[in-house]
Amino acid sequence: MNIEDYIIDHFYPKGDNDALRELLLVHSRCVAEAALEVCREHPELGADEEVVRTGAMLHDIGIVRCDAPSIHCFGSEPYIKHGPIGAEMLEEYRKGCSLGNALNKNQDCRPDDVFLKKMERICARHTGTGLPGLEPETTEEKIVCYADKFFSKTRPERRKTYDEALRSLEKFGQPGVEIFKGWHKQFGPKA
């Protein structure tokens, strides 16, 4: 098992809210695949593919604590906060919550603190809009954020076109649209 499998199993145990777990897995796999496409299309970026893949799989871990019934989230927090909430959840895990002991059984899946801190940052910063001060900064954070804009949780397996992704950002204001356009120039398909 990969580290994200342990973490997802911990926060989304099978049989608890299987509809939300499946939605998270499908969405995250789609984002991970798209993010890895960026890494492979743009090796000049020097992005760490393991950080990108794992970050994409964990970027939405915080939705379980949010209130968004239309996508099976029955928590109490506003959905806009799912990124920082996910970062807090990963910090709890990193500091040794119950899952830490399980990882000792499989040394291959035991990341160091630096790796998990990178995952926390990706969670906190992946929305890229709506939360001042939490904009993605590293190349890996930006790639996950960019890839995430092409997928929704209402139709998780359908990849949006560039224009559809752009339109979905307009409600958050022009600055986010301009950032996405810049990312598309940097991360989009080569001509």
Enumerate the language-model features and the residues they cover:
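Acidic/His-rich, divalent-metal-binding segments that scaffold phosphate/diphosphate chemistry
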Residues: M1-Y79
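Intrinsic structural disorder/low-complexity segments
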Residues: G62, Q107-R110, F187
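Acidic/histidine metal-binding catalytic segments
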Residues: P43-T54, G96-H126
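Metal-dependent catalytic cores of enzymes that make or break cyclic nucleotides
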Residues: R65-P84, E91-E92, G96-Q107, P132-E137
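Divalent metal-dependent phosphate-bond-processing catalytic cores, especially two-metal-ion Mg2+/Mn2+ enzymes
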Residues: A19-L45, L58, Y93-S98, F115-K117, ...
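Short secondary-structure boundary micro-motifs
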Residues: I7, P13, I63, N106, ...
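Generic beta-strand or strand-like secondary-structure segments
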Residues: I85-E92, K118, I122
